[in-house]
Swiss-Prot record:
Keywords: Oxidoreductase, tRNA processing. It holds the Pfam family UPF0176_N. GO terms for biological process: tRNA modification. This is tRNA uridine(34) hydroxylase. Belongs to the TrhO family. It comes from Xanthomonas campestris pv. campestris (strain B100). PROSITE patterns: RHODANESE_3. The keyword tRNA processing applies. Its EC number is 1.14.-.-. Residues 127-221 form the Rhodanese domain. It is an enzyme of class 1 (oxidoreductase). It comes from the Bacteria. The active site is at residue 181. InterPro entries: Rhodanese-like_dom, Rhodanese-like_dom_sf, TrhO, TRHO_N.
Amino acid sequence: MITNTAAYQFAPIHDPQQLADSVLERAQQRALKGSVLVAEEGINLFLAGDAEQIAGFYAWLHADARFAQMRVKYSHSAEQPFARLKVKVKPEIISFRRDDASPLQGRAPSVAPAMLRKWMQQGHDDHGRPLVLLDTRNAQEVAYGTFQGALTLPIDKFTELPEALQPHRAALADATVVSFCTGGIRCEKAALWMHAEGMDNVLQLEGGILGYFEDVGGEGYDGRCFVFDERVALDAELRPLGDGAACADAGKI
């Protein structure tokens, strides 16, 4: 059985290449595969391997004060979902190209999965404001599943979100908006940008869809959650698609 992990942390990294080299060395020593991006704004990891080796790797990474609070989301599969290990240094750990959306300058308010489930059951937040769930993922991912009634955007890349959202801004003004994505990283940047744009009614879903599945299951969610590896998509119990479905992006890192 393979242990799969997804994790990220925004933190100042003064020498991204040095960190990338250390991560590569430690991951290789433990025969892990997957994708790691390092930038001056933080680290983004998708790693898979033997459970004991995964635990050892994250114990090492958590010992670094910059990543001590980093949440790791776990799932399991019968096969290794990654073909190789790649560790890269990039300008951003998720490309958004907006100077006013830097998590190093602060963090947008968040909502825990259990609270979001409660709000969805109620149809509004605890102040009676209508609830809008904003899917910040691209159209290919949304096709596999999303939250019931979510606002989805016709985008192919995350950088297209600001323009695609413009026609909806007036309609969102009187609602509590919860941005969400796969694991939390995109919705964190999206929520920050929206706050910078004057939309102070925006929250981010803590841990993203995978965190929601892990904490409370699939209530209020239709379908599966697309992932960028050979598992293709996960159900609410974090099980891979497993039906032989293929995807052009599956397994690419």
